[in-house]
UniProtKB/Swiss-Prot annotation:
RNA-binding listed as a keyword: yes
Native source organism of the sequence: Mycosarcoma maydis
Protein name: Eukaryotic translation initiation factor 3 subunit D
Annotated region described as RNA gate, given as residue ranges: 307-321
Annotated Gene Ontology cellular component terms: cytosol; eukaryotic 43S preinitiation complex; eukaryotic 48S preinitiation complex; eukaryotic translation initiation factor 3 complex; eukaryotic translation initiation factor 3 complex, eIF3e; eukaryotic translation initiation factor 3 complex, eIF3m
UniProt biased composition (Low complexity): 51-64
GO molecular function: mRNA cap binding; translation initiation factor activity
Assembly mode: Component of the eukaryotic translation initiation factor 3 (eIF-3) complex.
Biological function: mRNA cap-binding component of the eukaryotic translation initiation factor 3 (eIF-3) complex, which is involved in protein synthesis of a specialized repertoire of mRNAs and, together with other initiation factors, stimulates binding of mRNA and methionyl-tRNAi to the 40S ribosome. The eIF-3 complex specifically targets and initiates translation of a subset of mRNAs involved in cell proliferation. In the eIF-3 complex, eif3d specifically recognizes and binds the 7-methylguanosine cap of a subset of mRNAs.
InterPro entries: eIF3d
Pfam families: eIF-3_zeta
One record GO biological process: formation of cytoplasmic translation initiation complex
Lineage: Eukaryota, Fungi, Dikarya, Basidiomycota, Ustilaginomycotina
């Protein structure tokens, strides 16, 4: 019967485990070379007798193929260059064997990556657009010459680089597009709180219907003739000289009067409130100024020229519009793509949205609310646009012992007469198409071909590419108590000309149904607002900035100097005085 005998071990009185002295290894194993390794290394062989420095396989790498790719993969692992000597490489066992295919193949007209690269090589349209603004602080006025753009040339080089440059299997660790913050964080800013979107998405708060406090302004009736506009009967978008005010919260005289009479602690506008409620959908950076007074009241304000004064375009697209590249070698491409940058598209979308609301109303029929427009003065020469301000109070209290009330200034754009002959308040918004083949289009369909026949597909694509903007439209309409929302589809008359636009169609939407279609959770939005309000209520008296990180799904709250924002106002006033 076979017997089992334990092997002899070297005695070691100092350590537990295998011996580590000079006599630990047998004599026949003492001269074997050794290279360091880690447990996560992909070990393919015991030792490399010819090239222990890891500089082997140059010829294999030069040949390319699967072996060269495997060699690049192993560079992501290991503790040092020496460990690459033991990396595993798949050998081509069938290298000496080949089969000749003598069957005839039919050339396909549809190319693969090469055709995609050529398609991407089409040059972007050039030009630059601008818009004119006038009026007092917080006023927005688009005149007859607003949004006029200079025509530019074509830039094929940038399109070729854009179409050919694709992220591959080896570029997973390359840095993605870096965006700039909406405001530069100062060295004297003190971070108070940081909350990521994952935590914000778990918040919930049920809020009851609001209480109306007062209403101001006057509304024009919506012109029903625009319901019959189609792609074949498209109408030109006119540039109409009207004034519409977008005053920030702390400069609103009505809110000052309400804060002196009411016990509410929080004050803001509907644009700020809708942004906070839909914050988890945002991609670009934005900022909100928070001011806490000595009596404990909190005002949420916007910066002049900030994110609240302009609309974004394709913010949520998988490949959103990109800024023009810097450098002399990209100068031609930057000039060609200047009209399709995020900033240029944002200015164009704001111009379109304003003028569409001005154009689709009948100024002969006027509906006046309780009070006159609180921002209009006799010094203004241009007529007022159709706009009404409704001041409403929401109860955000979760406990009776801790009452939290929010006063919001909401806006409606026009009115219409329903079947019951009652006046119904509506909001008027627009979506714009710039170039279906340009970078940043987000796979949008050609509206002139598909809008009439496949409007559902067009709207679904816009919901995907502009999820944040459409969610804000729906929430703002709900906050204002609007019965319906009129949505216009507007496209450039020529993809390379930003000065002329065409109204291709319109549609009626119910704000609550639109919010449900886009999975907008209002209780989650109110939970976000209550969380931010609690942070401001618990903070000390002073000024704060709530900033969305430009490259992360995070918001941060900073304590800033008391004169923050006033420096920019002084610069604007000096420029107006010089003019």
């Amino acid at each position: 019967m076979a017997s089992f005998k334990l092997p002899e071990l070297q005695p070691d009185n100092d350590l537990w485990g295998p011996a580590s002295g000079s006599n630990a290894l047998p004599a026949e194993l003492k001269d074997i070379p050794f290279a360091p390794y880690a447990k996560n290394d992909k070990v393919g062989r015991i030792a490399d007798w010819n090239n222990a420095s890891g500089a082997s396989n140059d010829a294999a790498n030069a040949r390319g193929g699967r072996q060269g790719r495997a060699r690049d993969v192993q560079q992501n692992f290991g503790t040092s260059a020496a460990s690459s000597a033991f990396a595993y490489f798949h050998g081509d066992d069938e290298a000496s064997f080949s089969v000749v295919d003598n069957t005839r193949t039919v050339a396909s007209r549809r190319g693969g990556l090469g055709q995609m690269s050529q398609r991407g090589g089409r040059g972007g349209r050039g030009g630059a657009g601008g818009a004119g603004a006038a009026g007092g602080r917080g006023a927005s006025k688009f005149g007859a010459g607003a949004g006029r753009g200079a025509r530019g040339g074509r830039g094929g080089a940038a399109g070729a680089r854009r179409g050919g440059g694709r992220f591959g299997w080896k570029e997973w660790d390359k840095p993605q597009r870096i965006r700039e913050a909406s405001v530069t964080v100062g060295q004297d800013w003190e971070q108070v709180e940081e909350i990521d979107f994952v935590r914000l998405g778990k918040l919930r708060l049920e809020v009851e219907e609001p209480q109306d406090i007062s209403s101001y302004g006057s509304l024009f009736e919506y012109d029903r003739s625009y319901d019959r506009v189609t792609v074949k009967t498209a109408q030109s978008l006119s540039s109409i000289d009207r004034i519409r005010y977008n005053t920030t919260t702390s400069e609103d005289p009505v809110i000052h009067d309400i804060s002196a009479k009411e016990d509410a602690q929080i004050y803001m506008t509907d644009s700020i409130l809708a942004l906070l409620m839909c914050a988890t959908r945002s991609v670009y950076s934005w900022d909100v100024i928070i001011t806490k007074t000595a009596d404990g009241k909190v005002f949420f304000d916007k910066r002049d020229g900030g994110a609240f004064d302009y609309l974004t375009v394709n913010e949520n697209a998988a490949d959103p519009p990109s800024e023009a590249s810097e450098g002399k070698e990209n100068e031609a491409a930057a000039k060609a793509n200047a009209i399709n940058t995020p900033s240029a598209l944002s200015l164009e979308a704001t111009y379109i949205n304003q003028n569409f609301a001005f154009q689709v109303v009948n100024e002969k029929n006027v509906y006046k609310l309780e009070h006159e427009n609180p921002f209009y003065s006799s010094d203004e020469t241009a007529p007022l646009a159709s706009c009404a301000y409704r001041y409403r109070k929401f109860n955000l209290s979760s406990e009776e012992s801790d009452p939290v009330e929010l006063v919001v200034r909401t806006e409606v754009d026009a009115y219409t007469v329903g079947a019951s002959k009652e006046k119904q308040l509506i909001t008027i918004k627009s979506l714009n198409e710039f170039d279906a083949r340009a970078q940043g289009a987000g796979g949008a369909l050609d509206w002139r071909l598909k809008l009439d026949s496949q409007r559902g597909a067009v709207v679904a694509t816009e919901m995907k590419n502009n999820s944040f903007k459409l969610a804000r439209f729906a929430v703002q309409s709900l906050l204002a108590g609007a019965d319906s929302m009129k949505l216009g589809y507007i496209s450039r008359a020529n993809p390379k000309d930003t000065s002329r636009h065409m109204i291709l169609g319109t549609s009626w939407l119910k704000p609550r149904e639109l919010a449900a279609q886009m999975a907008v959770n209002l209780s989650n939005g109110w939970g976000i607002v209550r969380t931010v309000a609690d942070l401001a209520r618990k903070a000390e008296q002073g000024k704060y900035v709530l900033l969305k990180d430009p490259n992360k799904q995070t918001i941060r709250m900073y304590r800033v100097p008391a004169n923050f924002g006033e420096e920019n106002d002084e610069i604007v006033e000096e420029d107006e005085a010089d003019e």
